[in-house]
Amino acid sequence: MELSALTAVSPIDGRYGDKADALRPIFSEFGLLRFRVEVEVRWLQKLASHVGIPEVPALSAAANALLDGIVSNFNESDAARIKQIERTTNHDVKAVEYFLKEKVEVNPELAAVSEFIHFACTSEDINNNSHGLMLKTARDEVIKPYCEKLISELKRLAHEYRDMPLLSRTHGQPATPSTMGKEMANVAYRLERQFKQIMAVEILGKINGAVGNYNAHVSAYPEVDWHQFSEEFVTSLGLNWNPYTTQIEPHDYIAELFDAIARFNTILIDFDRDVWGYISLGHFKQRTVAGEIGSSTMPHKVNPIDFENSEGNLGLANAVFQHLASKLPISRWQRDLTDSTVLRNLGVAVGYSLIAYQATLKGISKLEANAGAMAADLDANWEVLAEPIQTVMRRYGIEKPYEKLKELTRGRRVDAEGMRTFIDTLELPEHVKVELKKLTPANYIGQAQRLVDLLK
């Protein structure tokens, strides 16, 4: 069978392939090879820039242009050639080195220094920076826009439903009213906080040899300040430098990044479930799409499939994120190879996240608030006004206010007339009774509207 959307084992490349297209140039085998080529080329150019390494003299404009072109024009044919070389070497990074030596043969200046491709490097020097570039690119160019869009949509809903009263539910039971807008604002604020943490994670890199001590570097060029040279190189890639490592960059930052994304995802799961519940209660209707079928046997159904799809994919994403975050920082002594196969799954967790983000956004686009259903829910639960009444009773020194309201309301339905009759029995100033009688479940929303207004 040829690989296609129909034959792919993973739904990321199969059923949901079009939703993960943005990740293919980053996390695929092609993407990894492309970043490896970039790191190897930039290392050679960096060596040529140092006067203390005379065997690699400063490169001419033509030589630099050729090297830059290898990076910028890297294509699938180049990647296929590397894989062909790997069938002989049985070593993926060495195959990249040999590929580059082939590419520079046409330029005598570069051919003369071709043995300085991969100079003093362990494979992990190339790989860790490549993984760093993969994650930085994915975060900044793919994850960030989706996070921003989700937060923006939640803020839009918050302001759109600012004045729409909602019966809250704690423990699944009727509770103090809020507004639908304020509930959306809660989620927007939570997501925004985690998004800031995602973007604040420093993505690290190192290039310091087989065990992190520049052993090979110093043996060849003891006069060069390799510590400083390493920092300059890593930061030139747009990464943050890690000066203390074993053979591998210890991947702590990957755990930090994935834990932050997983928290963002967990909040989104919470949102998906809440909206699912609001749809079940009738508080939200879903705009139908012509031709769509909700159930193979029940023609009337319009199911909350987008939120369910999102919840499922976020669960998968977080399961992978959690394994990566707990496994990658652990490596026996100066390194073992267990991280190598695990690192090939960076895009899996991000892929499931991306599918979920798009599903949530699609679900949001179909939502239509059902103000009538929310109003009916509130009007059927006047007992929620027990809270403000007993609180005012406390202010005016009436004994056992909580207990009196508990006796009136617990396990009972109380209508507007019953609540007002109870207020009349209280020893309160007349103007206070008048104000209490003005309360309804729909207007007892505290500062919910102001809190939406304060959302930036």
Regions found by a protein language model. Name each.
Residues 1-34, 62, 85-89, 282-284, ...:
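Glycine-rich cofactor/substrate-binding loops
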Residues 2-217, 221-232, 294, 307-309, ...:
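A helix-coil-helix interface module used to build multimeric assemblies
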Residues 43-47, 99, 103, 138, ...:
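Generic, well-ordered alpha-helical scaffold segments in large soluble proteins
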Residues 123, 218-221, 234-236, 241-248, ...:
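A structural signal for small-residue-enriched, beta-sheet-centric alpha/beta enzyme cores
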Residues 136-144, 148-151, 155, 185-188, ...:
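Short amphipathic alpha-helical segments with heptad-repeat character
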Residues 157, 161-164, 198-201, 205, ...:
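Hydrophobic stripe of amphipathic alpha-helices that form coiled-coil interfaces
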Residues 194, 240, 246-332:
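Glycine-rich anion/phosphate-binding loop at the beta-strand->alpha-helix junction
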